[in-house]
Each structure stands twice: as structure tokens, then as C-alpha cells.
Amino acid sequence: MQNIKEYVEAKKLALKEQLNGNNNLKAVIVQVGDVEASNRYVRNKIKDLEEVGIRIGLVKCPETISEDALLDRLRKLNIDQSVTGYLVQLPLPKHISEERVNSVIYPWKDIDGFNALSKTVPATPLGVYTYLKDMNYEFSGKNAVIIGRSNIVGRPMHKLLLDANMNVTVLHTKTSEEDKKFYLEHADLIVVAAGKAGVLNKSYKLKETAVVMDVGINFNEEGKLIGDCEKDLPVAFQSPVPGGCGLLTRLAVIENLVALANDNN
């Protein structure tokens, strides 16, 4: 497996050359509130998009904005012909429904792919899948285990891997420990997106040939970013955190925007 940072940089360079500065693409990021973690993610996304020559707009809303007021802003972006696509930075304040927000975003402007009618695939599973595909990973007939069943990662990841002819099992909070051990022991590919540090650790017997993609984002007591997996698992490849699936997600955001532009043309 190629180093993920090197892979992402090479793909971004190729996208920049493809766009060649001669494009009218514009992405807008809508951010509610001023949480430092979200600020960091937004800064990174802006940096990525600017590096490949895409114009950026940032709409910052106060944390106290009402749901209706936010939805009105999104509806304006839906009809703004200068905007190729946009995304709403998550998480949102508790008084705002992510489901309602996702349903308002027009499918042909949905960079994140969270609207049920969107052609785009949510960025994290798309990024993971595309990386594995570009690494010539042999999906067909192999056993995949996904830990987590969110609409953002687990469920769309399940569809991608199933469509690639893998035998896919989804583990979640109601899966017994006995079943978890069994499926993990036989897994060729493990995608971990549980949102809990240490969910996959060295207490489990894993195949030495297994590939582990750690999508988790957690912070330890020292405030350092860590994944859902214990480090240095005895497998063939384990994506790092940081510097792994987060980079793949950000790359997929760019690729989704380009795909939207191509579809809309």
C-alpha cells in the first residue's frame, strides 16, 4: 500500500493539472458555530480546494442561528448559479436537525453526498474505497468487516464493498463479543468507524494479511488526535491517524465537487 499522504498529494497534483486554472468551479462551506475542531477541518478543506485551483466561499453562522434561518441560507445556495456545490460542516448544534439540513441540500449541489437522492457518495467511504481500488486491492470474494453503521460511513461503505463483490459484515453496539471475535478473525478488510478509541485492539486475533482502515476521530487525554484502533496492529496494513482516512476524505470532497460539475454540464 502506498503512503496515504504521498498518494493524496499525487492525486491533488493530477487534479490541479486537469483543471489547469481554467474552471469556474466554486465550492461553499457552511459552518455553524466556532468550535476549534470544526475550524481546523474547515481550514484544511479550504487549503485543499485552493491548492487545486477551486474558488472557495465560507458562510459562517452563529451557533444560535435557528434551524429555519439556516435552511433559508441553504436554499439560497441551491439557486445560486455561481456555486458548483456546497457542504455543511458537521457536527451541528443540537437544536438543528442534520436530517432536515441534508434533505434541503439539492442533490446536484451536494458535495458530501448526504442527501438520499444525491449521485455523489459520502466522502469518507468514497475516499477509502477509491484508495483501495487505486492500490489494486482485490475486493471480489474477500471478507470485509465494517465496525459502525452510521449513515455517513458504515452504511454507504457497506454498499460500496458489496457492489465490489465482497462478503460484508457490519458490527455495531448490539453485536455480541463472541460474534465480533469470529468475524474479525476471518476478515480480509476491516473498516473501523465506531467513533470510540480502542474498539479494535490487539486482544482480537486478526489475519496477518488483513488491511485495516481506521476512520475514527478521537482525542486522548493529552488532546492528541487518535483513531478507533490500537496502534501497530499485527496486520499487513493499517491506515495511520492522523494522516490517513482524514486525508482521503478531504480528497474525495474535491473529487465529488468535480463530479458534480461534470454531471451538471
Each language-model region and where it sits:
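Positively charged, low-complexity intrinsically disordered leader regions
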Residues: M1-N23
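Anion-binding alpha/beta catalytic cores of soluble intermediary-metabolism enzymes, centered on
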Residues: Q18, G85-F139, K180, G198-V199
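Short beta-strand segments enriched in small/hydrophobic residues
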Residues: N23-D34
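Glycine-rich phosphate/diphosphate-binding loop of Rossmann-like nucleotide-binding domains
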Residues: S38-I46, P122-V211, N220, K224-C229, ...
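Short beta-strand elements in bilobed, periplasmic/extracellular small-molecule ligand-binding domains
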Residues: L49-E63, V168-L171
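Short, well-structured alpha-helical segments in soluble
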Residues: A69-Q81
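Glycine-rich, N-terminal phosphate-binding loop of Rossmann-like dinucleotide-binding domains
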Residues: L90, A193-A194, V215-G216
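Rossmann-fold NAD(P)-binding glycine/threonine-rich loop
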Residues: E99-D112, M213-N264
